Regions:
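N-terminal alpha-helical interaction blocks
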Residues: 1-109, 175, 179-191, 234-237, ...
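Intrinsically disordered, low-complexity regulatory regions
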Residues: 199-446
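Intrinsically disordered, low-complexity boundary segments flanking structured domains
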Residues: 6, 55, 136, 158-159, ...
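Basic, glycine-/proline-tolerant helical and adjacent loop/strand elements
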Residues: 65-207
Length: 477
């Protein structure tokens, strides 16, 4: 095998993430440039870190890295409850995990990941989310494990360096952009080194992998690029996997927001609204991470959409938005719909119809509450539009009224009608506030307004301190 082809990159998300972690640890731009000498050096780093974590006292920060290993490799030599706590005795067992394949000694099998010749078979204790050695019905016929070549074995144990890890789970990235994949791995290698030195107590409690992905995408590309996050725990009794994805146009949306002050203002308003504090004033949910999560759609459908969250903010009467704030949030919603969903919307005539009807009523607040209740329901909205259209006609409206032909995209049960109705509400709320119709129960706080204006001058998708981590060099291990 040539010097620059010692490590393959496959389509398997865990092996792929591990291969990029190996490249980051070796200081290479991509896994294709990893040499046999690099594999040796990375193997030595992994062995040293595993042994140190597995033999560390429970009250030390090093033990936090053992928790990571336990979540990924239960019952391995490094995590078994009956393991030795003598580093000298444990080291040979860990080194043996990454021993050279010796095809001359017997039968060779194609590696499960890259199809290279392999003489070692592994099962769940060493491979996250794979079957145990007892599940012979799911394993290759007559083989008590999955064949794994040396390069892929090292990659699978370098995985936690390139993943976003917690004490109980790991998150890896699959991405069409190699630049984003490399950036994600490098940031997480730095973070992993910090966990080993300071433990999880030394890390921001509200940080999330989605924030790191958005920062990587922002720096990598402005074109089309799909990303997938795989979050999992390789538990003995109840392993689980959660998959979330971004749409391919999200990088274009990020670039548009980052280059536009009103959109940055809208994003920072969204972040601030999602920040949560406990009774002592400590942050328990970071707004940056929670906002980033809205751009990821769960495979099982259990995720909050960005447009839905923006609608809740604009419809909540307890929130005090200035005209500028409301315009920024509405513009953010329209930009997302246009950039990510490819929606072309001209809702101003219908929005004007509803705003006129609300404003000209004897109780604008009452009519607004009526519209708020009907806004997302196709049937209720259709009924309200008929009512508004008829009332304004009877009152002798001097402006042209949007007729039923313009209502169709909003009240039919068709693709993107729900999103259209949310955007309509956003535009109606902006028109009402521009006209001075009271919407919220509170007035906007001038101090908060100044803070948001200052935030709007900053990048929207910064790495939130990840770039401040010192670069890790293998010589420090």
């Amino acid at each position: 095998m040539g010097e620059v082809s010692a490590l393959a990159v496959t389509g398997h998300p865990l092996q792929r993430a591990g291969a990029w972690a190996v490249a980051a640890l070796a200081g290479r731009d991509d896994p294709g440039r990893v040499s046999e000498a690099d594999l040796e050096a990375v193997s030595a780093v992994v062995v040293a870190d595993v042994v140190a974590a597995a033999t560390a006292p429970k009250d030390t920060s090093r033990y936090d890295w053992w928790k990571v290993l336990f979540a990924l490799y239960p019952n391995s030599k490094a995590t078994h409850s009956k393991r030795t706590f003598d580093p000298a005795a444990l080291r040979p067992d860990i080194e043996n995990l990454f021993a050279q394949d010796r095809p001359e000694d017997g039968r060779t099998l194609p590696c499960t990941f890259c199809s290279a010749k392999a003489t070692v078979v592994w099962a769940k204790s060493n491979l996250p989310l794979f079957d145990t050695s007892k599940a012979l019905n799911a394993l290759p016929p007559g083989i008590a494990g999955w064949p794994v070549c040396r390069g892929c074995r090292i990659a699978m144990w370098a995985l936690p360096y390139g993943a976003w890890v917690t004490a109980g789970s790991a998150t890896v990235l699959s991405c069409e952009s190699e630049t984003a994949q490399r950036d994600f791995a490098r940031r997480n290698v730095r973070r992993a080194r910090r966990v080993m030195h300071a433990g999880f107590t030394g890390m921001p409690a509200t940080a999330r992998p989605e924030t790191v992905v958005l920062a990587a995408l922002r720096d990598a590309t402005e074109g089309l690029c799909a990303t997938t996050l795989w979050t999992f725990k390789n538990d003995n009794q109840d392993p689980w996997l959660r998959v979330t994805r971004t749409r391919r146009a999200v990088p274009a949306f990020l670039a548009t927001v980052d280059g536009n002050a009103p959109l940055r203002r809208g994003w920072h308003l969204l972040r601030r609204s999602l920040t949560r504090y406990d009774a002592q004033g400590r942050t328990v949910a970071g707004g940056a991470g929670e906002a980033a999560r809205l751009l990821f759609e769960a495979e099982d459908g259990r995720s909050r959409p960005l447009l839905g969250q923006l609608h809740r903010l604009l419809a909540d009467t307890d929130d005090a938005w200035s005209v500028g704030d409301r315009e920024a949030l509405a513009r953010l919603a329209f930009t997302y719909a246009e950039e990510v969903f490819g929606m072309e919307t001209d809702l101003e005539p219908v929005a004007t119809l509803i705003a006129d009807w609300i404003e000209q009523g004897t109780s604008p607040r009452g009519r607004l509450a009526e519209y708020r209740n009907a806004a997302l329901n196709d049937y209720k909205l259709g009924t309200l539009l008929i009512q508004a259209y008829t009332r304004l006609q009877l009152d002798g409206s001097k402006t042209p009224l949007a007729g039923p032909e313009l209502w169709k995209p909003l009240i039919r049960r068709q693709s993107r009608a729900w999103e259209q109705r949310m955007l309509l509400f956003a535009q109606v709320s902006v028109l009402l506030q521009q006209r001075g119709v009271p919407i919220g129960a509170k007035e906007a706080d001038p101090q908060q307004e100044r803070e948001i204006e200052a935030l709007a001058e900053r990048p929207a998708f910064a790495g939130d301190g990840e770039d401040e981590y010192d670069d890790y060099e293998m010589g420090q291990a």
